[in-house]
């Protein structure tokens, strides 16, 4: 267990610190999860089998466990809408699933090489853009669940969704210049 202790911490900063401690060739897959995540007993087997069948990037289905308040119910609904459209919907159309930052499995060698170039405040959207740019398809495992707890406070909800909106705009404006080239070269996922 590696404990990251930073004055100002971020998920990416912690992931980068962990990856710097791991040697290439030791592992096949990086699995990104949050500390509160719980998985089914066959979760790792399913992810490993999917990887072994040729998928280098995998997103599993995050489900919120506790829904004691209206805000947490809204949070769970929002996440299921995203699962339906941005993950299952994309895959049904032949496009890559969107990453959600939890229950995400990526080829170890690719991840270790690319994580070094990311900023400490980057998130899964930047990783997703890199995968798509390299035409690495993100598989979605709709029936492989990651159970997550969610802070149900209104302030936390609005902060998270404000960050999500900011990330969407950042991703749009960062990648919009690549749109014509992506379409012309047939990288429809990236477009």
Model-derived features: positions:
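Long helical/loop segments within the catalytic core of UDP-sugar-dependent glycosyltransferases
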Residues: 4-16, 22-27, 46-120, 162-173
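A short, conserved beta-strand element in the Rossmann-like catalytic core
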Residues: 9, 37-39, 63-65, 126, ...
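Short, hydrophobic alpha-helical packing/hinge segments within bilobed ligand-binding/sensory domains
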Residues: 14, 127-128
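Short aromatic/hydrophobic "clamp" motif used to bind/position activated sugar donors
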Residues: 30
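Acidic donor-binding/catalytic loop of UDP-sugar-dependent glycosyltransferases
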Residues: 34-50
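Basic/Trp-rich segment in TM-proximal cytosolic loops or flexible interdomain/linker regions
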Residues: 93-94, 152-191
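Acidic donor-binding loop at a coil-to-helix junction in glycosyltransferase catalytic cores
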Residues: 121-127
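Catalytic donor-sugar/metal-binding loop of nucleotide-sugar-dependent glycosyltransferases
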Residues: 128-146
């Amino acid at each position: 267990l590696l404990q990251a202790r930073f004055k100002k911490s971020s998920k990416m900063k912690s992931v980068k610190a962990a990856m710097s401690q791991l040697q290439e060739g030791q592992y096949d897959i990086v699995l990104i999860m949050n500390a509160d995540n719980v998985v089914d007993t066959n979760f790792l087997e399913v992810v490993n089998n999917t990887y072994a069948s040729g998928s280098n990037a995998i997103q599993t289905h995050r489900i919120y466990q506790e829904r004691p308040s209206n805000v947490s119910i809204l949070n769970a609904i929002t996440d299921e809408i995203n699962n339906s459209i941005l993950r299952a919907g994309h895959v049904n159309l032949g496009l890559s699933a969107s990453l959600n930052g939890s229950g995400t499995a990526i080829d170890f060698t690719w991840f270790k090489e690319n994580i070094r170039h990311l900023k400490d405040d980057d998130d899964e959207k930047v990783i997703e853009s890199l995968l798509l740019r390299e035409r690495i398809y993100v598989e979605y495992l709709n029936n492989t669940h990651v159970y997550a707890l969610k802070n149900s406070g209104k302030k936390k909800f609005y902060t998270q969704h404000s960050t999500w909106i900011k990330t969407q705009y950042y991703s749009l404006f960062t990648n919009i210049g690549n749109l014509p080239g992506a379409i012309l070269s047939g990288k429809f996922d990236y477009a």
